[in-house]
From Swiss-Prot:
GO cellular component, one term: plasma membrane
Membrane topology category: Multi-pass membrane protein
Localization terms from the record: Cell membrane
Protein name, as recorded: Uncharacterized protein HI_0825
Transmembrane segments: 22-42, 63-83, 110-130, 140-160, 186-206, 213-233
Source organism (scientific name): Haemophilus influenzae (strain ATCC 51907 / DSM 11121 / KW20 / Rd)
Domain of life: Bacteria
Record keywords, A-Z: Cell membrane, Membrane, Transmembrane, Transmembrane helix
Amino acid sequence: MLINFTQVLQDSWNFFRNQKKIMLQFVAILFIVQSASALLSFSVNDENKNDVLNLANTDITSFIFSVAITQILTSFIAAWGLTSIHKISLQNYRTLGETFSLTLRRFAGVILLDLLMVAPMLLGLGEAFAALLTKKSPSIMSLIAMLVGVWFFVRLNLTVVHYLSTQEALSQTIRKIWMRGNTRKGVLFIYTLLVYFLVPILIFQLSAFSNNAVFDMVIGIFTALLNIFMLVVTYRFYSLFMKD
């Protein structure tokens, strides 16, 4: 089945408008988490502002901890949103509390799938970063690892949606999405480019114009709204992707 991305975006927007109460609840939740994360990061940076030239004295542990907590919370909100969208699409949605419980039960698997998707890419990036720190040129192997990692990510980035939308085990989920993607690599690449490259670039460009608290808040709300909308796009694309 051919996938028309213009139609996917239009259908996703119609869904967002029709379910705006629930969607805006998720926008609010994500905005609160992002704002709390920004305040926490600012606090860590402020404490270490006198150590900019002495990275050895910077509290790296606190920074990594705050980033990890933020990432876990963001991943959970995304999984919660996808579960809710799935239930609404099946006309089986009741409350946010119900989908929260369903997401919580499957969240350990979501974390494992997320790690599996990014691990090869992170290995390549880690090796390249280590080479730069030692003032050496990154090896060919690190470049190959990054390219393989990107390819691996493209092939598996729908596993989380499938895992949350079904009761299948992790191994079944990976196998099904991998096999399904054997003949649909092109549309997978376009989807990945849209969701994981173009949207983040747009958000980054908007953030670059930030110069006051009010504008920061507007950008934060828009970012949260765009991220929740992209969850709808993801689910809609996944639904078409899995059709014969």
